[in-house]
């Protein structure tokens, strides 16, 4: 019953369409794996499922006024046609016989490269669903849903079957771009050093500092966000990690004399370089989902595995992914280049009021 309520929420969260965006295209679908899911298990009236893994290759035109919301897009490298290229991993689960499905697509916004829909709706764990155990209770399959995931965040570290996105680095007249980077760090346990991101898991590729000289950066600490911050003197911290008894210089970590206090908020501001055009992650979701929903083939006549199989599409996200959903709708990425709605409904779960911070300069999704 709880699963049916979740599914029903997808239809209730139908949001208004937003202004159209510019030309963009899935130019090539690269299918790397295709085969039976769950050993061909029959999921009730829907029957067996198919598992398709690959990569989508995109192009966008920076000069289109409707792409102006993607920060630094005009500073990205261009191909011979004057377009910006990027790519996104994708993972698709679909009924083997489309006629037995419900003609609905559920797009699950991955969280730091990790798939969450099967965990949420099917009570299943795993980032590379392939077996019957990975289907969990089989709810979404018995109901006939097609499930799609695409990479969108350019800072995700490879490994553990995380979904990646290849986003270009912005350059100004061929030279590296530098700018201020703001990082928040909070640890649950006392540690001597920490990677430069909110969570303690090594999942993000950080923007490298221009210099490891702490006099060119600022590190503050406070017991909670409502309290005033205290600056840590530059000789009492370093860009480094603790290895045993040794302090090793590391551009991706911060070391604090006496260690980081559990639960305290540490804020680091430093000069970083080589910003990714992170807003293209929204274009990847928009154009990837639109392709699977509407198109028959890519530019090279590779067939869309969902061609003529989808009538409605919905987007779902939890926490960081929910913030992405909020931002996607607010910034106008729910209409494709042909002025068609990409998603008919959206469910943003435990996202809070924040956005994804992915269309700002030197963006680093929280």
Describe each model-derived feature in a short phrase.
Residues 20-24:
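Sec/Tat signal peptide C-region and signal peptidase I cleavage site
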Residues 25-366:
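C-terminal His-loop and adjacent cap/lid subdomain of alpha/beta-hydrolase
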């Amino acid at each position: 019953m709880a699963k049916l309520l979740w599914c029903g929420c997808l239809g209730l969260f139908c949001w208004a369409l937003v202004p159209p965006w510019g030309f963009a295209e899935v130019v090539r679908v690269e299918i790397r794996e295709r085969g039976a899911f769950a050993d061909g298990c029959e999921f009730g009236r829907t029957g067996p499922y198919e598992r398709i893994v690959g990569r989508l290759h995109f192009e966008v035109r920076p000069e289109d006024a409707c792409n102006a919301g993607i920060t630094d897009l005009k500073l990205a490298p261009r191909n011979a046609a004057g377009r910006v290229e990027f790519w996104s991993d994708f993972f698709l689960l679909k009924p083997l016989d489309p006629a037995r499905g419900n003609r609905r697509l559920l797009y699950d916004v991955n969280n730091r490269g990790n798939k969450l829909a099967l965990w949420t709706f099917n009570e299943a764990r795993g980032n590379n669903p392939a077996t019957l155990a990975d289907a969990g209770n089989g709810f979404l399959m018995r109901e006939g849903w097609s499930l799609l995931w695409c990479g969108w965040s350019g800072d995700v570290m490879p490994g553990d079957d995380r979904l990646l996105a290849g986003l270009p680095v912005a350059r100004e007249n061929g030279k590296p771009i530098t700018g201020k980077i703001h990082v928040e760090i909070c640890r649950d346990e006392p540690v001597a050093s920490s990677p430069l991101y909110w969570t303690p898991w090594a999942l993000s590729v950080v923007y490298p500092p221009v210099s490891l000289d702490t006099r060119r950066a600022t590190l503050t600490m406070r017991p909670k966000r409502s309290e005033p911050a205290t600056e840590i003197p530059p000789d009492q911290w370093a860009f480094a990690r603790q290895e045993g008894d040794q302090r090793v210089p590391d551009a991706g970590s911060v070391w604090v004399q006496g260690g980081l206090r559990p639960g305290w908020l540490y804020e680091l501001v430093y000069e970083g370089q080589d910003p990714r055009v992170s807003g293209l992650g929204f274009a990847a979701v928009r154009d990837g989902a639109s392709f699977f929903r509407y198109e028959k083939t890519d530019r090279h006549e590779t067939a869309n595995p969902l061609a003529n199989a989808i009538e409605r599409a919905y987007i779902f996200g939890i926490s960081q992914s929910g913030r992405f959903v909020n931002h996607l709708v607010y910034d106008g990425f729910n209409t494709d280049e042909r002025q068609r709605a990409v998603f008919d409904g959206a469910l943003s779960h435990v996202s809070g009021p924040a956005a994804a911070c992915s269309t700002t300069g030197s963006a680093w999704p929280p």
